[in-house]
């Protein structure tokens, strides 16, 4: 007789190896948080480049939450909730290195988290 705990352990093992995927709208907050996480990491890694971009484009502003997240080296994701999806898109796609650096990094991060997006 097979023990119930053996069956449960087998099901748990199968579930752990299967990659869960979720399809979300691009405006979903979970997608935005992944995008913003990549964005904050990119700003930290290329701070001088972002400062030069900001100096050349003074009307391109960042929400205060993004600035706080850049300089807070702890868990910053909770700081970034509530930023409007259109503002996230504007910030991320508004830099010249979006296609070459941010877009591939965002795609990779979403894929790693099992998230796929659909156009709204």
From Swiss-Prot:
Signal peptide bounds: 1-25
Q: Which GO terms describe its biological process?
A: fungal-type cell wall organization
Gene Ontology cellular component? fungal-type cell wall
Superkingdom per UniProt: Eukaryota
Reply yes or no: does the keyword Signal apply: yes
Tell me yes or no: is Protease among this UniProt entry's keywords.
Answer: no
Keywords assigned: Signal
The residue ranges crossing the membrane are none
Q: Which InterPro entries match?
A: SRP1_TIP1, Yeast_SRP1/TIP1_CWP
Instruction: Give the molecular function GO annotations.
Output: structural constituent of cell wall
Q: Pfam families of this UniProt entry?
A: SRP1_TIP1
> Its family?
Belongs to the SRP1/TIP1 family. Seripauperin subfamily.
From the Swiss-Prot or TrEMBL record, give the protein name.
Seripauperin-13
Q: Which organism is it from?
A: Saccharomyces cerevisiae (strain ATCC 204508 / S288c) (Baker's yeast)
Starting at the broadest rank, the lineage of the source organism is: Eukaryota, Fungi, Dikarya, Ascomycota, Saccharomycotina
Q: Which gene encodes it?
A: PAU13
């Amino acid at each position: 007789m097979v023990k119930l705990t053996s069956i449960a352990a087998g099901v748990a093992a199968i579930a752990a190896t299967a990659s869960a995927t979720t399809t979300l709208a691009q405006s979903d907050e979970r997608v935005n948080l992944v995008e913003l996480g990549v964005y904050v990491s990119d700003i930290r890694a290329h701070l001088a480049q972002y400062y030069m971009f900001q100096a050349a484009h003074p009307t391109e502003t960042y929400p205060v939450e993004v600035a706080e997240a850049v300089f807070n080296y702890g868990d910053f994701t909770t700081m970034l909730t509530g930023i409007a999806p259109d503002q996230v898109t504007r910030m991320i796609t508004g830099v010249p290195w979006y296609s070459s650096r941010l877009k591939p990094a965002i795609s990779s991060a979403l894929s790693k988290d099992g998230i796929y997006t659909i156009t709204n």
